[in-house]
Amino acid sequence: MQIQFHLYNTLSRTKEVFNPQDQTKVKMYVCGPTVYDNPHIGNSRSVVVYDLLYRIVIKIFGEQSVKYVRNITDVDDKIIDRAELLSITINELTDKVTQEFHTNMAYLGCLLPSIEPKATEHIDVMIEIIERLIAKDHAYIADNHVYFDVLSAPNYTELSNRNLEEMFEGVRIENSKTKKHPQDFVLWKPAKPNESANMNFKSPWGFGRPGWHIECSAMSYKYLGENFDIHGGGADLIFPHHTNEIAQSRCAFPDSTYAKYWVHNGFLTVNGEKMSKSLGNFITVRNLMDKEISGEVVRLFLLSSHYRRPLDYNDKAIEDAKKTLDYWYRAIENINVQKIDLPHNFMQSLLDDMNTPLAVKIINDYAKGVFISKTEEEKQLNASAIITCANFIGLMNKTPHEWFNSGVDELYINELLNKRLEAKKQKNWLLADQIRNQLLEEKIILEDKPDGTTIWRKE
Protein backbone atom coordinates (compact mmCIF):
# COMPACT_ATOMS: atom_id res chain seq x y z
CA MET A 1 0.00 0.00 0.00
CA GLN A 2 1.37 3.43 -0.96
CA ILE A 3 2.16 5.73 1.96
CA GLN A 4 0.15 8.97 1.94
CA PHE A 5 1.83 11.98 3.51
CA HIS A 6 -0.55 14.87 4.12
CA LEU A 7 1.16 18.25 4.25
CA TYR A 8 -0.37 21.70 4.69
CA ASN A 9 0.36 23.86 1.66
CA THR A 10 0.32 27.61 2.35
CA LEU A 11 -0.25 28.19 -1.37
CA SER A 12 -3.58 26.34 -1.43
CA ARG A 13 -4.33 26.83 2.28
CA THR A 14 -5.27 23.15 2.57
CA LYS A 15 -3.70 19.87 3.64
CA GLU A 16 -2.68 18.03 0.49
CA VAL A 17 -1.35 14.56 -0.24
CA PHE A 18 2.35 15.03 -0.93
CA ASN A 19 2.98 13.88 -4.47
CA PRO A 20 6.46 14.86 -5.70
CA GLN A 21 7.08 15.54 -9.37
CA ASP A 22 9.50 12.59 -9.47
CA GLN A 23 9.51 10.02 -6.65
CA THR A 24 13.12 9.15 -7.41
CA LYS A 25 14.22 12.81 -7.14
CA VAL A 26 12.35 14.58 -4.34
CA LYS A 27 13.55 18.19 -4.13
CA MET A 28 13.37 20.36 -1.00
CA TYR A 29 14.63 23.91 -0.39
CA VAL A 30 14.66 25.70 2.97
CA CYS A 31 15.75 29.27 3.68
CA GLY A 32 18.82 29.10 5.91
CA PRO A 33 20.44 31.65 8.22
CA THR A 34 21.71 35.14 7.47
CA VAL A 35 25.08 34.78 9.18
CA TYR A 36 25.46 38.14 10.93
CA ASP A 37 24.84 37.01 14.54
CA ASN A 38 24.52 33.81 16.57
CA PRO A 39 21.31 31.82 15.90
CA HIS A 40 18.51 32.37 18.40
CA ILE A 41 15.93 29.87 19.64
CA GLY A 42 13.40 31.09 17.04
CA ASN A 43 15.83 30.35 14.19
CA SER A 44 16.41 26.89 15.59
CA ARG A 45 12.69 26.03 15.51
CA SER A 46 12.69 26.35 11.74
CA VAL A 47 15.77 24.15 11.34
CA VAL A 48 14.39 21.42 13.65
CA VAL A 49 10.98 21.45 11.90
CA TYR A 50 12.52 20.96 8.45
CA ASP A 51 14.98 18.43 9.81
CA LEU A 52 11.96 16.35 10.83
CA LEU A 53 10.32 16.89 7.43
CA TYR A 54 13.56 15.73 5.77
CA ARG A 55 13.58 12.57 7.93
CA ILE A 56 9.96 11.78 7.00
CA VAL A 57 10.55 12.28 3.28
CA ILE A 58 13.68 10.09 3.47
CA LYS A 59 11.64 7.39 5.23
CA ILE A 60 9.04 7.40 2.44
CA PHE A 61 11.23 7.77 -0.64
CA GLY A 62 14.72 6.67 0.49
CA GLU A 63 17.78 8.77 1.31
CA GLN A 64 19.25 8.56 -2.20
CA SER A 65 16.03 9.95 -3.69
CA VAL A 66 15.90 13.17 -1.64
CA LYS A 67 17.89 16.34 -2.25
CA TYR A 68 17.65 18.87 0.59
CA VAL A 69 19.13 22.31 -0.07
CA ARG A 70 19.46 24.85 2.77
CA ASN A 71 21.30 28.04 1.92
CA ILE A 72 23.63 30.34 3.83
CA THR A 73 22.97 34.06 3.28
CA ASP A 74 26.42 35.58 3.60
CA VAL A 75 25.80 38.86 1.75
CA ASP A 76 23.49 41.34 3.45
CA ASP A 77 23.41 44.87 4.87
CA LYS A 78 23.13 43.42 8.40
CA ILE A 79 26.42 41.59 7.88
CA ILE A 80 28.18 44.78 6.79
CA ASP A 81 26.83 46.72 9.78
CA ARG A 82 27.69 43.96 12.26
CA ALA A 83 31.25 43.49 11.00
CA GLU A 84 31.81 47.24 11.25
CA LEU A 85 30.42 47.29 14.80
CA LEU A 86 32.75 44.45 15.87
CA SER A 87 35.74 45.88 13.95
CA ILE A 88 36.34 42.60 12.10
CA THR A 89 36.30 41.69 8.43
CA ILE A 90 33.14 40.45 6.78
CA ASN A 91 34.73 37.06 6.07
CA GLU A 92 35.77 36.71 9.71
CA LEU A 93 32.21 37.41 10.81
CA THR A 94 30.45 35.13 8.31
CA ASP A 95 32.91 32.26 8.89
CA LYS A 96 32.53 32.55 12.67
CA VAL A 97 28.72 32.71 12.63
CA THR A 98 28.43 29.90 10.06
CA GLN A 99 30.59 27.68 12.27
CA GLU A 100 28.45 28.61 15.29
CA PHE A 101 25.30 27.75 13.33
CA HIS A 102 26.68 24.31 12.48
CA THR A 103 27.69 23.71 16.11
CA ASN A 104 24.24 24.77 17.32
CA MET A 105 22.40 22.53 14.85
CA ALA A 106 24.57 19.52 15.77
CA TYR A 107 23.69 20.22 19.43
CA LEU A 108 20.01 20.06 18.43
CA GLY A 109 20.52 16.74 16.63
CA CYS A 110 19.83 18.03 13.11
CA LEU A 111 20.98 16.16 10.03
CA LEU A 112 23.12 17.99 7.49
CA PRO A 113 21.34 19.02 4.29
CA SER A 114 22.43 17.47 1.00
CA ILE A 115 23.80 20.84 -0.16
CA GLU A 116 24.44 24.07 1.73
CA PRO A 117 25.22 26.77 -0.85
CA LYS A 118 26.51 30.21 0.06
CA ALA A 119 25.01 33.26 -1.62
CA THR A 120 28.42 34.83 -2.37
CA GLU A 121 29.37 31.78 -4.45
CA HIS A 122 26.34 32.13 -6.75
CA ILE A 123 26.45 35.76 -7.88
CA ASP A 124 26.76 34.64 -11.53
CA VAL A 125 23.43 32.76 -11.34
CA MET A 126 21.74 35.78 -9.75
CA ILE A 127 23.01 38.03 -12.54
CA GLU A 128 21.76 35.53 -15.15
CA ILE A 129 18.24 35.56 -13.68
CA ILE A 130 18.18 39.37 -13.36
CA GLU A 131 19.20 39.68 -17.03
CA ARG A 132 16.33 37.37 -18.00
CA LEU A 133 13.89 39.51 -16.00
CA ILE A 134 15.11 42.72 -17.67
CA ALA A 135 14.84 41.11 -21.12
CA LYS A 136 11.25 40.05 -20.39
CA ASP A 137 10.27 43.52 -19.08
CA HIS A 138 9.76 42.30 -15.51
CA ALA A 139 12.68 44.38 -14.21
CA TYR A 140 14.11 47.81 -14.92
CA ILE A 141 17.13 49.99 -14.08
CA ALA A 142 16.66 53.19 -12.09
CA ASP A 143 19.25 55.25 -10.23
CA ASN A 144 21.89 52.46 -10.57
CA HIS A 145 19.48 49.96 -8.98
CA VAL A 146 17.70 47.09 -10.70
CA TYR A 147 14.09 46.74 -9.53
CA PHE A 148 11.49 44.05 -10.06
CA ASP A 149 8.20 45.40 -11.43
CA VAL A 150 5.65 43.88 -9.05
CA LEU A 151 2.64 44.77 -11.20
CA SER A 152 4.11 42.75 -14.08
CA ALA A 153 3.88 39.53 -12.06
CA PRO A 154 0.68 37.49 -12.44
CA ASN A 155 -0.94 36.41 -9.15
CA TYR A 156 1.62 38.30 -7.05
CA THR A 157 -0.57 38.05 -3.92
CA GLU A 158 -1.39 34.32 -4.30
CA LEU A 159 0.85 33.04 -1.48
CA SER A 160 -0.04 35.66 1.14
CA ASN A 161 -3.74 35.80 0.15
CA ARG A 162 -3.86 39.54 0.87
CA ASN A 163 -4.53 42.54 -1.34
CA LEU A 164 -1.54 44.55 -2.52
CA GLU A 165 -2.23 47.67 -0.46
CA GLU A 166 -2.72 45.68 2.75
CA MET A 167 0.49 43.70 2.18
CA PHE A 168 2.61 46.84 2.09
CA GLU A 169 1.11 48.57 5.12
CA GLY A 170 3.94 49.28 7.57
CA VAL A 171 6.60 47.97 5.19
CA ARG A 172 9.59 50.28 4.86
CA ILE A 173 10.02 51.22 1.20
CA GLU A 174 13.47 52.38 0.05
CA ASN A 175 14.28 54.64 -2.92
CA SER A 176 10.57 55.05 -3.63
CA LYS A 177 11.14 58.09 -5.89
CA THR A 178 13.18 56.05 -8.35
CA LYS A 179 10.69 53.19 -8.68
CA LYS A 180 7.81 52.77 -11.09
CA HIS A 181 5.66 51.59 -8.20
CA PRO A 182 6.28 51.87 -4.44
CA GLN A 183 5.97 48.07 -4.05
CA ASP A 184 8.78 47.22 -6.50
CA PHE A 185 11.73 45.51 -4.83
CA VAL A 186 15.48 45.52 -5.37
CA LEU A 187 17.18 42.83 -7.45
CA TRP A 188 20.57 44.58 -7.51
CA LYS A 189 21.85 47.57 -5.56
CA PRO A 190 24.99 49.68 -6.09
CA ALA A 191 27.88 49.69 -3.64
CA LYS A 192 27.89 52.58 -1.21
CA PRO A 193 30.92 54.89 -1.00
CA ASN A 194 33.76 53.46 1.15
CA GLU A 195 31.93 50.13 1.49
CA SER A 196 33.85 46.86 1.82
CA ALA A 197 34.89 45.45 -1.55
CA ASN A 198 34.35 41.81 -0.55
CA MET A 199 30.61 42.43 -0.04
CA ASN A 200 30.21 43.83 -3.57
CA PHE A 201 30.62 42.28 -7.00
CA LYS A 202 31.03 43.17 -10.67
CA SER A 203 27.83 43.19 -12.69
CA PRO A 204 26.41 44.66 -15.94
CA TRP A 205 24.92 47.41 -13.74
CA GLY A 206 28.13 48.33 -11.97
CA PHE A 207 29.80 47.29 -8.75
CA GLY A 208 27.23 46.23 -6.17
CA ARG A 209 25.40 43.32 -4.58
CA PRO A 210 22.16 41.38 -4.94
CA GLY A 211 18.91 41.99 -3.14
CA TRP A 212 17.90 39.37 -0.59
CA HIS A 213 15.07 37.73 -2.55
CA ILE A 214 17.02 36.95 -5.72
CA GLU A 215 19.55 34.91 -3.72
CA CYS A 216 17.16 32.05 -2.90
CA SER A 217 15.69 32.01 -6.41
CA ALA A 218 19.20 31.63 -7.81
CA MET A 219 20.38 28.91 -5.44
CA SER A 220 17.19 26.84 -5.72
CA TYR A 221 17.42 27.10 -9.53
CA LYS A 222 21.09 26.10 -9.53
CA TYR A 223 20.58 22.91 -7.49
CA LEU A 224 16.93 21.98 -7.98
CA GLY A 225 16.01 23.45 -11.36
CA GLU A 226 13.04 25.59 -12.40
CA ASN A 227 10.54 23.39 -10.53
CA PHE A 228 10.88 21.56 -7.23
CA ASP A 229 8.66 20.02 -4.58
CA ILE A 230 8.97 21.65 -1.14
CA HIS A 231 9.95 25.17 -0.10
CA GLY A 232 10.11 25.75 3.65
CA GLY A 233 10.72 28.62 6.05
CA GLY A 234 9.26 30.59 8.93
CA ALA A 235 5.80 32.17 8.66
CA ASP A 236 7.50 35.58 8.75
CA LEU A 237 8.96 34.82 5.31
CA ILE A 238 5.60 34.43 3.53
CA PHE A 239 5.75 38.14 2.74
CA PRO A 240 7.80 39.69 1.37
CA HIS A 241 10.54 37.08 0.88
CA HIS A 242 8.67 34.04 -0.43
CA THR A 243 6.12 36.16 -2.28
CA ASN A 244 8.96 37.88 -4.14
CA GLU A 245 10.79 34.62 -4.79
CA ILE A 246 7.73 33.20 -6.53
CA ALA A 247 7.21 36.36 -8.58
CA GLN A 248 10.76 36.66 -9.90
CA SER A 249 11.25 32.93 -10.51
CA ARG A 250 7.99 32.43 -12.39
CA CYS A 251 8.61 35.56 -14.46
CA ALA A 252 12.20 34.55 -15.29
CA PHE A 253 11.04 31.05 -16.26
CA PRO A 254 7.47 31.44 -17.63
CA ASP A 255 6.85 27.68 -17.88
CA SER A 256 7.82 27.21 -14.23
CA THR A 257 5.48 26.79 -11.27
CA TYR A 258 8.54 27.13 -8.96
CA ALA A 259 7.80 25.26 -5.68
CA LYS A 260 4.76 23.00 -5.50
CA TYR A 261 4.33 22.82 -1.71
CA TRP A 262 4.97 25.83 0.55
CA VAL A 263 5.49 24.91 4.21
CA HIS A 264 5.77 27.50 7.00
CA ASN A 265 6.42 27.06 10.72
CA GLY A 266 4.83 29.30 13.36
CA PHE A 267 6.38 32.02 15.49
CA LEU A 268 8.23 31.52 18.77
CA THR A 269 7.72 33.85 21.74
CA VAL A 270 9.55 34.08 25.07
CA ASN A 271 7.36 34.17 28.19
CA GLY A 272 4.46 35.30 26.02
CA GLU A 273 6.34 38.19 24.41
CA LYS A 274 7.99 38.65 21.05
CA MET A 275 11.72 37.99 21.37
CA SER A 276 13.85 41.11 21.02
CA LYS A 277 17.13 42.47 22.35
CA SER A 278 15.38 45.62 23.59
CA LEU A 279 13.16 43.53 25.89
CA GLY A 280 16.17 41.63 27.18
CA ASN A 281 14.60 38.27 26.27
CA PHE A 282 16.76 37.46 23.26
CA ILE A 283 17.87 33.84 23.74
CA THR A 284 20.55 32.32 21.54
CA VAL A 285 21.17 28.60 21.20
CA ARG A 286 24.61 29.28 22.69
CA ASN A 287 22.88 30.64 25.83
CA LEU A 288 21.17 27.28 26.27
CA MET A 289 24.39 25.37 25.64
CA ASP A 290 26.20 27.48 28.25
CA LYS A 291 23.45 26.64 30.77
CA GLU A 292 24.21 22.96 30.05
CA ILE A 293 20.64 22.31 28.94
CA SER A 294 20.68 19.14 26.85
CA GLY A 295 20.16 19.62 23.13
CA GLU A 296 17.64 16.76 23.30
CA VAL A 297 15.57 18.74 25.81
CA VAL A 298 15.52 21.79 23.53
CA ARG A 299 14.69 19.64 20.49
CA LEU A 300 11.78 17.95 22.28
CA PHE A 301 10.51 21.36 23.41
CA LEU A 302 10.62 22.60 19.79
CA LEU A 303 8.67 19.53 18.64
CA SER A 304 6.15 19.62 21.51
CA SER A 305 3.77 21.95 19.67
CA HIS A 306 2.45 21.50 16.13
CA TYR A 307 4.88 23.18 13.76
CA ARG A 308 2.29 25.61 12.36
CA ARG A 309 1.16 26.81 15.78
CA PRO A 310 2.86 29.51 17.89
CA LEU A 311 5.28 28.18 20.51
CA ASP A 312 6.22 29.91 23.76
CA TYR A 313 9.66 29.44 25.31
CA ASN A 314 9.62 29.52 29.11
CA ASP A 315 11.34 27.73 31.99
CA LYS A 316 8.37 25.45 32.66
CA ALA A 317 8.25 24.27 29.05
CA ILE A 318 11.94 23.33 29.21
CA GLU A 319 11.45 21.62 32.60
CA ASP A 320 8.51 19.65 31.17
CA ALA A 321 10.60 18.51 28.20
CA LYS A 322 13.38 17.39 30.58
CA LYS A 323 10.89 15.45 32.75
CA THR A 324 9.44 13.76 29.67
CA LEU A 325 12.85 12.62 28.47
CA ASP A 326 13.75 11.45 31.99
CA TYR A 327 10.55 9.36 31.95
CA TRP A 328 11.39 7.82 28.57
CA TYR A 329 15.00 7.06 29.51
CA ARG A 330 13.88 5.58 32.84
CA ALA A 331 11.44 3.35 30.97
CA ILE A 332 14.18 1.74 28.85
CA GLU A 333 16.71 1.47 31.69
CA ASN A 334 18.08 -2.05 32.28
CA ILE A 335 16.07 -3.43 29.34
CA ASN A 336 17.63 -5.02 26.28
CA VAL A 337 16.02 -2.71 23.71
CA GLN A 338 16.17 -3.44 20.00
CA LYS A 339 15.30 -1.33 16.98
CA ILE A 340 11.99 -2.48 15.49
CA ASP A 341 9.85 -1.30 12.58
CA LEU A 342 8.28 2.10 13.24
CA PRO A 343 4.90 1.46 14.88
CA HIS A 344 2.03 2.20 12.48
CA ASN A 345 0.20 4.64 14.78
CA PHE A 346 3.38 6.65 15.37
CA MET A 347 4.19 6.92 11.66
CA GLN A 348 0.58 7.87 10.89
CA SER A 349 0.80 10.77 13.36
CA LEU A 350 3.77 12.19 11.46
CA LEU A 351 2.17 11.53 8.07
CA ASP A 352 -0.73 13.74 9.17
CA ASP A 353 1.00 17.09 8.61
CA MET A 354 3.79 16.26 11.09
CA ASN A 355 1.53 15.98 14.14
CA THR A 356 4.36 15.93 16.68
CA PRO A 357 2.16 16.48 19.79
CA LEU A 358 0.40 13.19 18.95
CA ALA A 359 3.73 11.49 18.18
CA VAL A 360 5.08 12.54 21.60
CA LYS A 361 1.90 11.27 23.29
CA ILE A 362 2.33 7.90 21.57
CA ILE A 363 5.90 7.59 22.91
CA ASN A 364 4.58 8.50 26.37
CA ASP A 365 1.99 5.73 26.06
CA TYR A 366 4.75 3.22 25.27
CA ALA A 367 6.65 4.42 28.36
CA LYS A 368 3.54 3.88 30.51
CA GLY A 369 3.28 0.46 28.92
CA VAL A 370 6.74 -0.45 30.18
CA PHE A 371 5.83 0.33 33.79
CA ILE A 372 2.55 -1.60 33.72
CA SER A 373 3.79 -4.55 31.64
CA LYS A 374 3.04 -7.94 33.18
CA THR A 375 5.70 -9.86 31.24
CA GLU A 376 9.33 -9.21 30.32
CA GLU A 377 8.43 -9.72 26.65
CA GLU A 378 5.77 -7.01 26.80
CA LYS A 379 8.14 -4.70 28.66
CA GLN A 380 10.87 -5.21 26.04
CA LEU A 381 8.43 -4.59 23.17
CA ASN A 382 7.25 -1.29 24.68
CA ALA A 383 10.81 -0.18 25.46
CA SER A 384 11.93 -1.04 21.92
CA ALA A 385 9.04 1.01 20.52
CA ILE A 386 10.15 3.99 22.65
CA ILE A 387 13.72 4.00 21.36
CA THR A 388 12.65 3.36 17.74
CA CYS A 389 10.14 6.22 17.70
CA ALA A 390 12.33 8.65 19.64
CA ASN A 391 15.37 7.96 17.45
CA PHE A 392 13.29 8.64 14.34
CA ILE A 393 12.49 12.18 15.50
CA GLY A 394 16.11 12.76 16.55
CA LEU A 395 15.86 11.98 20.26
CA MET A 396 17.27 9.46 22.80
CA ASN A 397 20.68 9.06 21.20
CA LYS A 398 22.32 8.31 24.56
CA THR A 399 22.20 5.33 26.89
CA PRO A 400 20.17 5.81 30.09
CA HIS A 401 23.45 5.80 32.05
CA GLU A 402 24.89 8.59 29.86
CA TRP A 403 21.64 10.55 30.10
CA PHE A 404 21.21 10.43 33.86
CA ASN A 405 24.89 10.89 34.66
CA SER A 406 25.89 13.60 32.23
CA GLY A 407 27.96 16.26 33.96
CA VAL A 408 28.76 13.91 36.86
CA ASP A 409 32.32 13.21 38.05
CA GLU A 410 32.17 9.41 37.94
CA LEU A 411 35.71 8.99 39.32
CA TYR A 412 34.78 11.02 42.42
CA ILE A 413 31.56 9.02 42.96
CA ASN A 414 33.31 5.68 42.53
CA GLU A 415 35.95 6.69 45.09
CA LEU A 416 33.20 7.45 47.61
CA LEU A 417 31.44 4.17 46.79
CA ASN A 418 34.66 2.26 47.44
CA LYS A 419 35.04 4.05 50.80
CA ARG A 420 31.42 3.21 51.63
CA LEU A 421 31.91 -0.44 50.65
CA GLU A 422 34.97 -0.63 52.92
CA ALA A 423 32.99 1.01 55.76
CA LYS A 424 30.21 -1.57 55.36
CA LYS A 425 32.74 -4.42 55.43
CA GLN A 426 33.99 -3.04 58.75
CA LYS A 427 30.37 -2.58 59.92
CA ASN A 428 30.92 1.16 60.19
CA TRP A 429 27.27 1.92 59.38
CA LEU A 430 27.56 5.54 60.49
CA LEU A 431 30.25 6.31 57.89
CA ALA A 432 28.35 4.34 55.23
CA ASP A 433 25.21 6.43 55.90
CA GLN A 434 27.23 9.67 55.94
CA ILE A 435 28.60 8.88 52.46
CA ARG A 436 25.08 8.02 51.21
CA ASN A 437 23.73 11.32 52.58
CA GLN A 438 26.68 13.27 51.17
CA LEU A 439 25.93 11.90 47.70
CA LEU A 440 22.22 12.50 48.17
CA GLU A 441 22.93 16.18 48.85
CA GLU A 442 24.71 16.19 45.49
CA LYS A 443 21.58 14.60 43.94
CA ILE A 444 23.19 11.18 43.53
CA ILE A 445 20.88 8.33 44.56
CA LEU A 446 22.34 4.99 45.66
CA GLU A 447 20.64 1.62 45.38
CA ASP A 448 22.11 -1.35 47.27
CA LYS A 449 21.55 -4.64 45.46
CA PRO A 450 21.05 -8.06 47.16
CA ASP A 451 24.37 -9.28 45.76
CA GLY A 452 26.23 -6.59 47.74
CA THR A 453 26.87 -4.23 44.82
CA THR A 454 25.68 -0.63 44.71
CA ILE A 455 24.41 1.21 41.64
CA TRP A 456 23.92 4.96 41.45
CA ARG A 457 22.07 7.46 39.36
CA LYS A 458 21.61 11.19 39.15
CA GLU A 459 18.33 12.43 40.66
From Swiss-Prot:
Coiled coil: none annotated. It catalyses: tRNA(Cys) + L-cysteine + ATP = L-cysteinyl-tRNA(Cys) + AMP + diphosphate. Keywords: Aminoacyl-tRNA synthetase, ATP-binding, Cytoplasm, Ligase, Metal-binding, Nucleotide-binding, Protein biosynthesis, Zinc. It is found in: Cytoplasm. Gene3D superfamilies: Cysteine-tRNA ligase, C-terminal anti-codon recognition domain, HUPs. SMART domains: DALR_2 (SM00840). Its EC number is 6.1.1.16. Disulfide bonds: none annotated. ATP binds at K277. Zn(2+) binds at C31, C216, H241, E245. A motif ('HIGH' region) lies at residues 33-43. Binds 1 zinc ion per subunit. It is an enzyme of class 6 (ligase). One of its GO terms (biological process) is cysteinyl-tRNA aminoacylation. Its main location: cytoplasm. NCBIfam families: cysS. HAMAP family: Cys_tRNA_synth (MF_00041). Monomer. This is Cysteine--tRNA ligase.
